[in-house]
């Protein structure tokens, strides 16, 4: 009798007749097969067992008495015969389908309580379950490929005897075909091995020792270099990288931003975009590595139990995570330095997550360029915001402006220049031509006009200074002439007062430029107001002092130049001039306020006369008095003791004759004779 079940029935029990043999196949694609010869040899070896003979007979006669739990199970054909598990009549109700499934798939049978009778599991049953191979899962713990190949070859050619049953001793020979059975014996032995726990503990100690050593080395390296921090748990490298130290990038970012050109700014922005791409690539590679490690961990846990892969994978995860974290921190530090050099805000947050992708970076860059272009321009709210921005790109404008200033004297590009500029800026030739037309009108022409105006102003200033200079010189010449006239006019008056009968020879010596229209008397001179111009007096005084120190061009000597060298006992030789005479001489002529007793050049004749009067007393020259023109009263010689003077015509005539008969050469000779006395 054949039965076919759709799906997965919860429990399979034998029929009442006890002759039903069933085979439970969880994976029909890996069913076990054997040939007719194997069946015959199996029947010959087990001929003493009647139950086994009945099973073989039923198997040969009823090839379709099987139960398939999969709807896609293949239909049996004449060339294939399946192994059936014989079930006796009294054991059919006690053994369930779960036990058969566990036996076929290599798991130890579970003790289940049945409603139909007691159930006992024989130790050989467990051994058969452990020795029955499972389907291969693609995992092997062997370290050598040769051993694995030898083991698989040994399993292919070595038959496995599975025996179960308490007293009947049914044996079924299962031969592994070329496709291989399910599972290697090594995995089943690992599960039931008593050395598994001890080996795992020993491996944990070795791995922990190595990890502690590596932690110490990494801490020492981080203290010296400062590039990598302490170890962090697995999974924090992608989320918490770059939090504490950023290495050389932070040092480079410590500098203050400087003014950058357009080319330098574009280069830094391109570098920043490349760094952001590298950062995303690093994160993607770490996620891929983490997924692969999770697959390995799940394979370990499936083979050796939950938590068994920690000893094998923890060290590798920590090492690789440290490398990824250091790489990410370095890239994040360089991005931060680029942001500071550009004067932008940091795009790396405090926890180290890079905020924003390449799209956000491009959007931020476009917004910044738009803000710079519209700087200082306030748009009315009624303007349409959706209207596209007018004007050429800033980079193209900078290139065109640079060419304009380089060829400022002739800003008319040729066709070749226009093609070259169009390639550099990415514009068309017509756009370049239009820009230069507008630039010459709006930029170049106003600059040229402004330069021309400044040049004209400078020329006007230069012409004004050149016209002003001759006028100033003429004014200064006139002022100097008037000053010289003021200086020379008192000399002429004094000479006239001193020499009323002089024929004019002394006037040429003193340098008078013209004769006065009328003669001045001492009374008129006394009535003139005193000039208080102290600046002209100071100039004249300095000039007089300079002339006192030198020798005159006509050979004469100043009277007062050597006056300070006389002895006190020699002062009696000079005449005594009254205070009125001094005042009259001081304030005479053009109101210049210069005293004539300071040693003016025209006083030489007077000094010589005085000296001649002292040396020649027999001539009867009156001392200390002055003869005025048209004065009828004549005075006689004055005495120093203050006595009265007698007026006689003889004395006046003698005085006039002596005055007119004076010789200038004799005066000079007399002065030359007195030089040794003055010097001594």
UniProtKB/Swiss-Prot annotation:
<dbReference type="GO" id="GO:0003677">
    <property type="term" value="F:DNA binding"/>
</dbReference>
<dbReference type="Pfam" id="PF07526">
    <property type="entry name" value="POX"/>
</dbReference>
<keyword id="KW-0805">Transcription regulation</keyword>
<keyword id="KW-0539">Nucleus</keyword>
<dbReference type="Pfam" id="PF05920">
    <property type="entry name" value="Homeobox_KN"/>
</dbReference>
<feature type="region of interest" description="SR/KY domain">
    <location>
        <begin position="193"/>
        <end position="209"/>
    </location>
</feature>
<feature type="region of interest" description="Disordered">
    <location>
        <begin position="127"/>
        <end position="178"/>
    </location>
</feature>
<dbReference type="InterPro" id="IPR006563">
    <property type="entry name" value="POX_dom"/>
</dbReference>
<feature type="compositionally biased region" description="Gly residues">
    <location>
        <begin position="240"/>
        <end position="251"/>
    </location>
</feature>
<dbReference type="GO" id="GO:0010201">
    <property type="term" value="P:response to continuous far red light stimulus by the high-irradiance response system"/>
</dbReference>
<dbReference type="InterPro" id="IPR001356">
    <property type="entry name" value="HD"/>
</dbReference>
<dbReference type="InterPro" id="IPR009057">
    <property type="entry name" value="Homeodomain-like_sf"/>
</dbReference>
<feature type="compositionally biased region" description="Polar residues">
    <location>
        <begin position="471"/>
        <end position="488"/>
    </location>
</feature>
<feature type="compositionally biased region" description="Low complexity">
    <location>
        <begin position="41"/>
        <end position="65"/>
    </location>
</feature>
<dbReference type="InterPro" id="IPR050224">
    <property type="entry name" value="TALE_homeobox"/>
</dbReference>
<feature type="compositionally biased region" description="Low complexity">
    <location>
        <begin position="136"/>
        <end position="153"/>
    </location>
</feature>
<keyword id="KW-0371">Homeobox</keyword>
<feature type="region of interest" description="Disordered">
    <location>
        <begin position="35"/>
        <end position="72"/>
    </location>
</feature>
<dbReference type="GO" id="GO:0046982">
    <property type="term" value="F:protein heterodimerization activity"/>
</dbReference>
<dbReference type="GO" id="GO:0009610">
    <property type="term" value="P:response to symbiotic fungus"/>
</dbReference>
<dbReference type="GO" id="GO:0009737">
    <property type="term" value="P:response to abscisic acid"/>
</dbReference>
<protein>
    <recommendedName>
        <fullName>BEL1-like homeodomain protein 1</fullName>
    </recommendedName>
</protein>
<dbReference type="GO" id="GO:0003700">
    <property type="term" value="F:DNA-binding transcription factor activity"/>
</dbReference>
<feature type="region of interest" description="Disordered">
    <location>
        <begin position="220"/>
        <end position="257"/>
    </location>
</feature>
<comment type="subunit">
    <text>May form heterodimeric complexes with TALE/KNOX proteins KNAT2 and KNAT 5. Interacts with OFP1, OFP2, OFP3, OFP4, OFP5 and OFP15.</text>
</comment>
<dbReference type="InterPro" id="IPR008422">
    <property type="entry name" value="KN_HD"/>
</dbReference>
<feature type="region of interest" description="BELL domain">
    <location>
        <begin position="264"/>
        <end position="335"/>
    </location>
</feature>
<dbReference type="GO" id="GO:0010197">
    <property type="term" value="P:polar nucleus fusion"/>
</dbReference>
<keyword id="KW-0804">Transcription</keyword>
<feature type="DNA-binding region" description="Homeobox">
    <location>
        <begin position="385"/>
        <end position="447"/>
    </location>
</feature>
<feature type="region of interest" description="Disordered">
    <location>
        <begin position="458"/>
        <end position="523"/>
    </location>
</feature>
<comment type="similarity">
    <text>Belongs to the TALE/BELL homeobox family.</text>
</comment>
<dbReference type="GO" id="GO:0042803">
    <property type="term" value="F:protein homodimerization activity"/>
</dbReference>
<keyword id="KW-0238">DNA-binding</keyword>
<dbReference type="GO" id="GO:0005634">
    <property type="term" value="C:nucleus"/>
</dbReference>
<dbReference type="GO" id="GO:0005737">
    <property type="term" value="C:cytoplasm"/>
</dbReference>
């Amino acid at each position: 009798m054949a039965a076919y079940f759709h799906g997965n029935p919860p429990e399979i029990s034998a029929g009442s007749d006890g002759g039903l043999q069933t085979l439970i196949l969880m994976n029909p694609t890996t069913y076990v097969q054997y040939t007719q010869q194997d069946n015959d040899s199996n029947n010959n070896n087990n001929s003493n067992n009647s139950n086994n003979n009945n099973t073989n007979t039923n198997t040969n006669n009823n090839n379709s008495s099987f139960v398939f739990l999969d709807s896609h199970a293949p239909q049996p054909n004449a060339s294939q015969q399946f192994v059936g598990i014989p079930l006796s009549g009294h054991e059919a109700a006690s053994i369930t389908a779960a036990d058969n499934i566990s036996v076929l798939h290599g798991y130890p049978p579970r003790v289940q309580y049945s409603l139909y009778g007691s159930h006992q599991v024989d130790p050989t049953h467990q051994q058969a379950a452990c020795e029955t191979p499972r389907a291969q899962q693609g995992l092997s713990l062997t370290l050598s490929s040769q051993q694995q190949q030898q083991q698989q070859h040994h399993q292919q050619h070595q038959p496995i005897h599975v025996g179960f049953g308490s007293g009947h001793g049914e044996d079924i020979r299962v031969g592994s075909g070329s496709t291989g059975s399910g599972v290697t014996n090594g995995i089943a032995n690992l599960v039931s091995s008593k050395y598994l726990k001890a080996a795992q503990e020993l491996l944990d100690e070795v791995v922990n020792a190595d990890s502690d050593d590596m932690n110490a080395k990494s801490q020492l390296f981080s203290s010296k270099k400062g590039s990598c921090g302490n170890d962090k748990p697995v999974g924090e490298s992608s989320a918490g990288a770059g939090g504490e130290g950023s290495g050389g990038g932070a040092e480079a970012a410590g500098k203050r931003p400087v003014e950058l050109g357009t080319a330098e700014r574009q280069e830094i922005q391109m570098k920043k975009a490349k760094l952001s791409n590298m950062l995303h690539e690093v994160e993607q590679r770490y996620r891929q590595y983490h997924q692969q490690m999770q697959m390995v961990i799940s394979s370990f846990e499936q083979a050796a139990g939950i938590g068994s892969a920690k000893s094998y994978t923890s060290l590798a995860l920590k090492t690789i995570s440290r490398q990824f974290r250091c790489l990410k921190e370095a890239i994040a530090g360089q991005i931060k330095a680029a942001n500071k050099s550009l004067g932008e805000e940091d795009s790396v947050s405090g926890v180290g997550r890079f905020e924003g992708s390449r799209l956000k970076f491009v959007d931020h860059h476009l917004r910044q360029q738009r803000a710079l272009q519209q700087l200082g321009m306030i748009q009315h709210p009624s303007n349409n915001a959706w209207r596209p921005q007018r004007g050429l790109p800033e980079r193209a404008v900078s290139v065109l402006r640079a060419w304009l200033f380089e060829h400022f004297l002739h800003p008319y590009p040729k066709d070749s220049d226009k093609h070259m500029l169009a390639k550099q800026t990415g514009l068309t030739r017509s756009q370049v031509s239009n820009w230069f037309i507008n630039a010459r009108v709006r930029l170049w022409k106003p600059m040229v006009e402004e330069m021309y105006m400044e040049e004209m102003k400078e020329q006007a200033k230069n012409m004004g200074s050149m016209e002003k200079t001759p006028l100033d010189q003429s004014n200064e010449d006139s002022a100097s002439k008037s000053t010289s006239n003021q200086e020379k006019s008192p000399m002429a008056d004094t000479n006239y007062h001193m020499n009323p009968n002089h024929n004019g020879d002394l006037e040429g010596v003193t340098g008078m430029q013209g004769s006065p229209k009328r003669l001045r008397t001492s009374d008129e001179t006394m009535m003139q107001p005193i000039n208080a111009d102290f600046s002209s007096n100071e100039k004249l005084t300095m000039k007089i002092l300079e002339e006192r120190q030198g020798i005159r061009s006509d050979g004469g000597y100043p009277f007062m130049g050597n006056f300070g060298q006389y002895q006190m006992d020699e002062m009696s030789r000079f005449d005594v001039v009254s205070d009125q005479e001094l005042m009259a001489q001081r304030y005479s002529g053009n109101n210049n306020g210069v005293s004539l007793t300071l040693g003016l050049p025209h006083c030489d004749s007077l000094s010589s006369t005085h000296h001649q009067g002292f040396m020649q007393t027999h001539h009867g020259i009156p001392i200390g008095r002055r003869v005025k023109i048209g004065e009828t009263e004549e005075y006689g010689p004055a005495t120093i003791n203050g006595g009265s003077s007698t007026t006689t015509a003889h004395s006046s005539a003698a005085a006039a004759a002596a005055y007119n008969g004076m010789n200038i050469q004799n005066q000079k000779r007399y002065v030359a004779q007195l030089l040794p006395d003055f010097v001594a």
